[in-house]
């Protein structure tokens, strides 16, 4: 199904407060559409949309759907029995899921840049956004986090350039139309949908095949799974990496806060030197991905350097929240063992006496499928506090719990305890934190509130 952006003028979003859904709604408001939507609770995103003219319902009931709506867009997180979804079907209102609708918007742009990969999508999209803005390309941007330089999670440009994250969950990125497709890495995740890593890799192969012959696949040569991707695409390829690739980083060193300095090479030719403003070795790879795309777009070296230098990070990605009594509070969205290790490595390079970590596992299915990997992810912390699992779209069957995870982590010699609620966690932190410690909250749920509660006492 395709969407007529001239004929259809009233669109309703089920789950309008989501990071991507709110961005799509904002794009339509800017284009003059009548926008309505619903969510289970009010948020900064819903309040922002209301200020821009959207009608937002808190609570999802059938009465929110009226016969004058031209299209209903829904998020994959909603139930098949959602009242609004069922009412839209009864009224024969056309339906699109979020990814399909985003694909329809992408059709209106010539140079779609889709950033995929298990880890690093938000940071790389944000880095690329900073560079293209520095180069005055006036892109439209959709990012999975709040980025200060665009004042939120969406920027509406007036050019052929469109930059977006492309998530592999339920193969949603196969509904996109990339001219440049980035694959940052391939790792085991979303195992509630995919059978195994091979099935995940096959999804990325399909994504690569979406890129037209004149387009580009940009991928990390350090990831051995990319070889199969490259051999299956019919487009130009530019690879990057620390170990190998067309674009590489050499002579890497770090400052006292873990931020990298390195030299960027294309084949054996040095292009320029670069200081990143965000910490962690993983961000070298994210930067190389954004540099590769920038070179394809013929963006000048000065614009690349200035764009990356001015990028200070996105919210919830190694975000320094503040200090209290000499304790630095940092928050990170990491929710996969690989991401957690990268975040802890970055924290290790940050000045600290001890690293005290509060982790909130995200979804029961992920905790079960990656249980062994989670138990080994926290070896570098001085103490770990586990909150209860954040369920997101899932129900607790009793099959897994944070206390089970805690038991196995303790067996590895890590000091760990399971404290269920945030108020009790903060009370415990008040008793153990001392000047010079780093308090690191990690997880994709609402664990950031622990740091905020600690700071705002």
From Swiss-Prot:
Entry's Gene Ontology cellular component terms: cytoplasm
Binding positions for ATP per the UniProt entry: 117-123
Catalysed conversion reaction: UDP-N-acetyl-alpha-D-muramate + L-alanine + ATP = UDP-N-acetyl-alpha-D-muramoyl-L-alanine + ADP + phosphate + H(+)
Ligase as UniProt keyword: yes
A GO molecular-function descriptor: ATP binding
Pathway in which this enzyme or protein is active: Cell wall biogenesis; peptidoglycan biosynthesis
Pfam families found in the cross-reference section: Mur_ligase, Mur_ligase_C, Mur_ligase_M
Entry-linked Gene3D superfamilies: Mur ligase, C-terminal domain, Mur-like, catalytic domain, NAD(P)-binding Rossmann-like Domain
Predominant location: cytoplasm
PANTHER family: UDP-N-ACETYLMURAMATE--L-ALANINE LIGASE (PTHR43445:SF3), UDP-N-ACETYLMURAMATE--L-ALANINE LIGASE-RELATED (PTHR43445)
Protein name: UDP-N-acetylmuramate--L-alanine ligase
Organism, scientific name: Clostridium kluyveri (strain ATCC 8527 / DSM 555 / NBRC 12016 / NCIMB 10680 / K1)
Lineage summary: Bacteria, Bacillati, Bacillota, Clostridia, Eubacteriales
């Amino acid at each position: 199904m395709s969407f007529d952006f001239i004929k259809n003028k009233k669109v309703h979003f089920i789950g309008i407060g989501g990071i991507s859904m709110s961005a799509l709604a904002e794009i339509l408001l800017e284009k003059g559409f009548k926008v309505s939507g619903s969510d289970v609770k009010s948020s900064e995103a819903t309040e922002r949309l209301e200020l821009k003219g959207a009608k937002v319902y808190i609570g999802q009931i059938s009465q929110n759907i009226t016969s004058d709506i031209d299209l209903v867009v829904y998020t994959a997180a909603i139930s098949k029995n959602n009242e609004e979804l069922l009412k839209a079907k009864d009224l024969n209102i056309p339906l699109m899921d979020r990814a399909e609708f985003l694909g329809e918007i992408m059709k209106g742009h010539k140079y779609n840049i889709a950033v995929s990969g298990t880890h690093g999508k938000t940071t790389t999209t944000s880095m690329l956004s900073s560079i293209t803005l520095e180069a005055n390309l006036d892109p439209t941007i959709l990012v999975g986090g709040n980025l200060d330089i665009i004042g939120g999670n969406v920027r509406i440009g007036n050019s052929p350039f469109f930059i977006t994250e492309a998530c592999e969950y339920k193969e949603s990125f196969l509904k996109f139309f990339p001219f440049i497709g980035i694959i940052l890495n391939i790792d085991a995740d979303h195992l509630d949908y995919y059978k195994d890593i091979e099935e995940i890799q096959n999804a990325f192969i399909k994504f690569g095949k979406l890129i037209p012959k004149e387009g580009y696949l940009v991928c990390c040569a350090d990831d051995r799974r990319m070889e199969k991707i490259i051999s299956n695409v019919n487009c130009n390829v530019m690879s990057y990496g620390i170990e190998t690739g067309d674009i590489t980083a050499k002579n890497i060193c770090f400052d006292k806060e873990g931020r990298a300095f390195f030299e960027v090479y294309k084949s054996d030719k040095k292009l320029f030197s670069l200081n990143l403003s965000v910490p962690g070795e993983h961000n070298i790879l994210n930067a190389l991905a954004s540099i590769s795309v920038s070179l394809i777009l013929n963006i000048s070296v000065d614009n690349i350097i200035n764009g990356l230098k001015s990028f200070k990070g996105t919210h919830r990605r190694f975000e320094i929240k503040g200090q209290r009594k000499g304790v630095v509070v940092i928050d990170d969205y990491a929710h996969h063992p690989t991401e957690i290790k990268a975040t802890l490595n970055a924290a290790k390079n940050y000045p600290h006496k001890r690293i005290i970590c509060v982790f909130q596992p995200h979804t029961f299915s992920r905790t079960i499928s990656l249980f062994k990997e989670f138990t080994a992810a926290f070896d570098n912390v001085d103490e770990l506090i586990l909150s209860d699992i954040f369920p997101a779209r899932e129900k607790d069957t009793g099959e897994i719990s944070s206390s089970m995870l805690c038991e196995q982590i303790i067996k590895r010699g890590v000091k760990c305890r399971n404290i269920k609620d945030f108020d009790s966690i903060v009370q415990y932190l008040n008793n153990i934190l001392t000047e010079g410690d780093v308090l690191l909250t990690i997880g994709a749920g609402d664990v950031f509130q622990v740091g905020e509660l600690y700071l705002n006492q």
